[in-house]
Amino acid sequence: MVSGPLALRWCPWAGHRDMGPDMELPSHSKQLLLQLNQQRAKGFLCDVIIMVENSIFRAHKNVLAASSIYFKSLVLHDNLINLDTDMVSSTVFQQILDFIYTGKLLPSDQPSEPNFSTLLTAASYLQLPELAALCRRKLKRAGKPFGPGRVGTAGIGRPTRSQRLSTASVIQARFPGLVDVRKGHPAPQELPQAKGSDDELFLGTSTQESTHGLGLGGPAGGEMGLGGCSTSTNGSSGGCEQELGLDLSKKSPPLPPTTPGPHLTPEDPAQLSDSQRESPAPTSTSALPVGNSASFVELGATPEEPMDVEGAEENHLSLLEGQGGQPRKSLRHSARKKDWNKKEPVAGSPFDRRETGSKGSCPGEEGEGTGDRVPNGVLASSAGGGGPSASYGEQSFPCKEEEENGKDGSEDSGQSGSEGGSGHTGAHYVYRQEGYETVSYGDNVYVCIPCAKGFPSSEQLNAHVETHTEEELFIKEEGAYETGSGGAEEEAEDLSTPSAAYTADSRPFKCSVCEKTYKDPATLRQHEKTHWLTRPFPCNICGKMFTQRGTMTRHMRSHLGLKPFACDECGMRFTRQYRLTEHMRVHSGEKPYECQLCGGKFTQQRNLISHLRMHTSPS
């Protein structure tokens, strides 16, 4: 065994003096930014949505908090942020968000003066001092006037919390004809200092985190903001250009493999001060590789010389590590078994609901759809018609999950958006990651809606459905006999007679509150949860409380417009997988539910049950 001075000769890294450049990887910060930008493009681990005008952008809270003091104060409690359209447009914010994730400012298709003036206004509003300094330098070189100081307009035109919670229901692609509503109107050259900006900064903060934000209440141009803009994408049909917002496309573009640099120790914080010197920005003739990140140049277009903010990429890494925190995890999703409890005791053995991994659009839930591939920045339809987007129309976005809560309010609390999908991402994301494997139903493709039980053939499903129907008819007709009603009594007698013995023997578990009976204890426990007074699962957006995590997760999809289950045939999206199963029968023409009295066939079980009630109701 080697010891003494010889050991140091074999281990030169044992002393601090030897830990020099050989132990650093200069491209580590670039690799980190590249990976973060790719994750944003795919929507992976994105935990905040920013709405600007009618455009939706997904991002990471940690990255926004490390780049802007303004965002840092908002993402503490909000998962949905609505920016003031008087201060920033969707096109400008696309450039700013690209810059935050790349550290590069590429030329846009707009004239230089209005674009930089607008960027300066938006950068001051979002408290991005580096971008503001860069815009001032560009305007100064061009001899254009600009505001002498940094504007602080954090509270001007800010919508209320209730306004921020509203989102449009129809998610559409951004078409090439879309233009900025503020295009052609120069941005205000100087805005008054906002006295109420602190109210905006600390809106909704709790006492626990108020001390964390007290040091942030300076002027709009904070000490540690980092921002900027990159090219303005216009949704060209070439597919090379991407808008890195929420990807609601049916298929996601493949993500080329990249080799991230090895992890290194945090860089020297002194880089931050170096990058904030208002010195002329050096130019570079190369942008990020097209294969490894979102492309910033139109197909067939010759890009102008890109601009780099000095040390921006290194500062991105320093700021991310300097925040001392990790991104908030999105809602936990775990695959649990699903039981359907209706008003009448109808239940079967649980059946594992599994995600098929397909993607598409939900039609209202069955009236909406997106047939085209949607870029990563998406447009929620507005009231204006015309153009390709007019075919989609506009609908209000009620919380339809709340209506479903009345039908299946006792679903398993462990059920959530993922419902057993891939381990790479939760099912409330609508994008595929590299290596994602689709999970199929196997042979049990015929699913009973109330109890979620699967069967390999429609005949077996019909036989199973009859047990539900007989039980419901027995309960209904039992009340009819007691009231002395005639007419359909004799007709329903054949159905109700065998169900009486069946229900007496197969439902030994009784609820202690309402005395309803169930087949198994698991279903009974789910029913008993409906009687609980406590609601431990709140919605992070509107604050509504739920007794079960799965119900709360589906409710949040209404706010975020996320519909993870899609039809491969037409691209329609659904928030619930059983609705996708029902919808697929529209394409196949299958009607597995048949009335035993008249022979009528139906695609959905609830239609059959309603039809049978017509037979048994007194005429």
From Swiss-Prot:
Residue list for modification Phosphoserine: 166, 169, 197, 349, 416
Positions with biased composition (Basic and acidic residues): 337-357
Domain BTB: 46-109
InterPro entries, A to Z: BTB/POZ_dom (IPR000210), SKP1/BTB/POZ_sf (IPR011333), Znf_C2H2_sf (IPR036236), Znf_C2H2_type (IPR013087)
Keywords assigned: DNA-binding, Metal-binding, Nucleus, Phosphoprotein, Repeat, Repressor, Transcription, Transcription regulation, Zinc, Zinc-finger
Biased composition regions of type Polar residues, renumbered to the chain: 281-293
Span list, region Binding to CtBP: 247-249
GO CC term (a single one): nucleus
Biased composition, class Gly residues, residue ranges: 214-228
Chief localization: nucleus
One Pfam family from the record: zf-C2H2
Zn finger limits (C2H2-type): 446-468, 509-531, 537-559, 565-587, 593-615
Disordered: annotated segments: 180-293, 307-426
Location in or out of the cell: Nucleus
Molecular-function annotations in GO: DNA binding; zinc ion binding
Biological role: Transcriptional repressor.
Family: Belongs to the krueppel C2H2-type zinc-finger protein family. Hic subfamily.
Subunit structure as annotated in this protein's UniProt entry: Self-associates. Interacts with HIC1.
Protein name: Hypermethylated in cancer 2 protein
Organism: Mus musculus (Mouse)
